[in-house]
Amino acid sequence: MFDKNKKVSVFAAYRGSATSKNYVQKGTKNFDKNGAAKNNNRNLASKNGGKLKGPLKRSGSYSDGDNGSSSSSGEDEEDDSTDSRGELYDSSESGEEYTLNNHSSQSSPETPAYTRESLKRRNDEAEGSKPIGAKRTSSTPVGQKDEEDDSTDSNGELYDSSESGEEYTLNSHSSQSSPETPANTRESLKRRTDEAEGSKPIGAKRTSSTPVGQKDEEDDSTDSSGELYDSSESGEEYTLNSHSYQSSPETPANTRESLKRRTDEAEGSKPIGAKRTSSTPVGQKDEEDDSTDSSGELYDSSESGEEYTLNSHSSQSSPETPANTRESLNRRNYEAEGSKPIGAKRTSSTPVGQKDEEDDSTDSSGELYDSSESGEEYTLNSHSSQSSPETPANTRESLNRRNYEAEGSKPIGAKRTSSTPVGQSTSAASKKNTVPVKVEVASPNRALLSPQSIEMEPGDSMFCRIKIGVIKSVQPGGDVGAEAGAGQAVNRLEPCHEVHKENSIEVGKRTLAQLIAPMTMATFLRDHWEKSPFRVITTTSGGFSNLISFKMIDKMLIQNHVEYTTNIDVTSYEDGVRKTLNPDGRALPPSVWAHYQRGCSIRILNPSSYLVQLRQLCVKLQEFFHCLVGANVYLTPPESQGFAPHYDDIEAFVLQVEGKKRWRIYAPTKELPRESSGNLSQTELGDPIMDIVLMPGDLLYFPRGWIHQAITEKDSHSLHITLSAYQQQSYANLMEKLMPLVVKESVEQTLKLRKGLPLDIFQNLGVANAEWNGVHRQKLIQHIQNLAQRLMPTEGQIDRALDQLAIKFQHEALPPTIAPQELKRTVYGAQATADKTGHCSLDYELAEGTAVRLLRANIVRLTVDEGVLRCYYYTDNGLEYCKYEPNFFELEPFHGTVIETLIHAYPDYTKIKDLPPMGNDEDRLEFVEALWERGILMVEKPFKKV
């Protein structure tokens, strides 16, 4: 075991100078309280994600235009009961109430048994006693274990009488201590004490071969919360919060399953939680392969994976929940040959997602599946004011996953099989007077089905003057024709077979390709990026339904501290006048929905702070775009308009989720502007280039500078998301960083630049002298121009200027999300145990032969600032825009060579012994271990099964 004290001294070696110089080491410094806690600057609301004067806050987006996004756990389709606060519950669940307060100087924990009991520490009674509040179901003395039965507390939680756990609230740097929830969570906050040799895993309920609450030898039973247990699993969920003000647990499996519970009908399948018919325990690895989840992430079926929200410096953390939910996330238990995954309809003898002889199957996102997987996604948020864990695979899969019925049938919810778009007229008169337009038709899942291209002619509701979006019918992710040969696709984007070996830039590229499919990336970048708008028509309406919904917004408002102006806007546009109608304070559902019923539009400025699935989408895209990808959500009542015509300074991707909305797009008055416009009047617009109605599942792209306005129709509301990218990411921004460097260094080297100005220069130059064309004036102008020509940037100056832009990305980026197969290879899956004497043991240890790599391609940036070598990183960023100062540490040159080697080796792994020498092998090992412990590195082979 390595010497931890010695490692601390190694950190001090390259951090000490920064400490003494008052440099920022890690993003623990906040801006002033007025900016960090509550920023009412309207620049934030009008230019989401843009620079603010003064303290910055993450808005999650950039533009003043219609932007947005969302995601949350849903409710049961049939019978959602509500408590006194209007919170939805499934009658089968043992849920709790949570008050999730964000930006709150004081945490107000809600009332569940765990929370109330954790407010006052429990005093465990005699040996074997049960937790306070556990209901007694036996004549056995209190807390004593019956031979066969585990008792439950009032919340339906299972307890083993061998446990005598206490609840602790471990809050550091907290203005008030808010207790965390049940024993499993609390034990994950503080290291668990392992018992004698042979004892059950940390937090495991049972040491018997029969799972807790299981009724017979072959059945996987559920506890009172509906949690599924297999005797081969000892999985639990942990919320690892450091410096946390309040942690609120997410609700149980039944609730999340009610989001998208699917009961499989066909022979051989079983619904979630059904009895097992296979000899392979749930989550146990099959003999041959690792599988992938719906995001293309590879999992080993031997994992008992859960979702984790790892928040550091977080005012709130919402842990994800139990087995049924985790299994509904991505766990697929394949029974006998021919069985299908949860919710999927089988049309082949080959297991769903299993590779056939020639083909790898993909989900709707183009992700590869294997029948042995049990994967989930994790969101690792640090320095977050709040983390809202997203829900299971069924939800993520619903981003694009469609359950295909019998062979030849159309996808569930598919519609609009006509070649005429909704709202478009095909009258003969309109055909004679308009120009045909080709728009892209997306397959139901934007990836799996063969794409089609249809030609439409604009009708009464789609006036068009020029061709927009002429698109070929090609395989998603590829291009055809002369570029590739007859019928041969190029640039096919396929996921890596192993998640921990994926290149995050390629993952982002593949994600974008799925959004714009069947248009190819080559066509998009060549013909439309920064050039012209286009529309993708889907053949199904549920393409983005898992990201946001009416119910999700209501739940988000209840469970999170969402404030007007900072997080949400109420707007209207009537008689050519745009108004913002924000009250003060927190935005609770009654207030928000009252404005909506009066015809106002609702804009959520930073939904990715609360909605994990939307955040996962943005995180993947930011790796490809190398800049923050933000999101806004817009909810507009029928026959309403919330915003005046305007243009934005971002590249916009509009995802229509619910209802329909009519968009009018106008040619730009200025190409690629650097700033957004103000509100424009209708008289400034002219004729629209595009006049279309977006339906659920449709996508619309338009570059920055293109004027747009949108209005709902009489018979429908509208809910849409706008993803925004590439704000302030131009050559002009690079030159603004570069030229000051050039001038500063040229002054040091050029005497003429340091000479004083002529005494008569004021009498010869300036606006008042512009009309005078005297000889002396011309000599002065020529001399100044000659000096400017000497300001030629060097390669080193260009590199340093680019690094300054990269630091901006490190500061703004969302923290990474971690997959289960990555979890067991990173610090986020590490655990510690302590014996009865308090001696702590770690479950990991790096060695010279350990192979490591960066967690993500853009996770770090090496820079030289004022002669000091620094490494910036974004693993500890918050979920709100620039909530903390940039995270970095200072390095010696030999430290820098190690990081540089890892950057160039990515995505490949490098053994520690093959990294550049650094004094001695022990110093190098400790430095690499220090990087791993900050979440920057990942090992190739897990230390243990997590």
Swiss-Prot record:
Give the source's domain of life in one word: Eukaryota
Q: Name one GO molecular function term.
A: 2-oxoglutarate-dependent dioxygenase activity
Per UniProt, the ranges with Basic and acidic residues bias are: 117-128, 187-198, 257-268, 328-338, 398-408
Catalytic activity, as annotated = N(6),N(6)-dimethyl-L-lysyl(36)-[histone H3] + 2 2-oxoglutarate + 2 O2 = L-lysyl(36)-[histone H3] + 2 formaldehyde + 2 succinate + 2 CO2
Q: GO cellular component terms? A: nucleolus; nucleus
Domain (JmjC) spans 606-742
Task: Provide the top EC class.
Answer: oxidoreductase
Q: Which family does it belong to?
A: Belongs to the ROX family. NO66 subfamily.
Q: Which Gene3D superfamilies match?
A: 3.90.930.40, Cupin (2.60.120.650), JmjC domain-containing ribosomal oxygenase (ROX), dimer domain (1.10.10.1500)
**In this chain, where does the modification Phosphoserine occur?**
S339
> What cofactors does the UniProt entry give for this protein?
Fe(2+)
Q: Which UniProt keywords apply?
A: Chromatin regulator, Dioxygenase, Iron, Metal-binding, Nucleus, Oxidoreductase, Phosphoprotein, Repressor, Transcription, Transcription regulation
* BP terms from Gene Ontology: negative regulation of DNA-templated transcription
| Its EC number(s) | 1.14.11.-, 1.14.11.27
Q: Where is the composition biased (Low complexity)?
A: 59-73
> Could you tell me what the cofactor note in this record states?
Binds 1 Fe(2+) ion per subunit.
Its name, as the record gives it, is: Bifunctional lysine-specific demethylase and histidyl-hydroxylase NO66
Q: Which Pfam families match?
A: JmjC_2 (PF08007), RIOX1_C_WH (PF21233)
Q: Where is this region: Disordered?
A: 14-435
Task: State the compartments where it is located.
Answer: Nucleus
Compositional bias annotation for Polar residues: 17-28, 37-46, 99-110, 169-186, 239-256, 309-327, 379-397, 416-433
Lineage of origin = Eukaryota, Metazoa, Ecdysozoa, Arthropoda, Hexapoda
